Amino acid sequence: MRTPKGYQEISRGYPILSGQITQGIKGFTESNFNYLKVSGKVEYAFNRPDKSSTELLLEGHYSAGEVPLTHLYHAYPNAPNKDEILQRFSVAGRRSFETMYFNEFFSDKLLVGQVKHHFAPFNIFSFLKPEMVLISKVAWGDLDNAQRHQNVAINTLEKGYFESGFELNKLLFGFGLSASYRYGAYHLPDFADNVAVKFTFYLEL
């Protein structure tokens, strides 16, 4: 809807499509590299009368040229590089991989998928209506010419990265808890390194 302050969303329809193109030009505004980055995202949601819903997300990223390390794709990691589970306790993201460590993987081509199923709120008390959400995420990626990036350990995602877990939201003042588990080809030898426990925050105004 158009308002004096611009366009505002009053209802959300699906699918939602978005995209982005970035061009790096060597010598322009002090840039040292020529590269191209293209990204696209599709979102869809099934909302049911019982207040449960299922959300689907698929996004793809592609880059070519002399892409610097700082501009490669990271697949939204959200695990601090700490040894203990409680040392990694932090805020869960909406799209991030909670068990993927910062700077663990780099890609110039990346495909990410996510499925979230929201159960109807549990009507325990008038002031306590927690919400359970089941989540599964997957990422595939690759990196050409990894040798360009020197003095850095480069890991890629060509075998597929898998993570599943749950959120129990709105337990107290909008805060909740989440737990995630990493499995598949990039499962780590130490069980605790594959587990992430975070807190969530959802506030409805």
What are the functions of these language-model segments?
Residues 30-32, 68-71, 126, 144-148, ...:
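Short conserved micro-motifs at the rims of enzyme active sites and ligand-binding pockets
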Residues 67, 117, 130-173:
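Outer-membrane beta-barrel transmembrane domain signature
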Residues 26-29, 99-102, 150-154, 184-189:
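Extracellular loop and loop/strand-boundary signature of outer-membrane beta-barrel proteins
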Residues 193-205:
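Outer-membrane beta-barrel "beta-signal"
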Residues 21-27, 46, 60-66, 119-121, ...:
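Transmembrane beta-strands of outer-membrane beta-barrel pores
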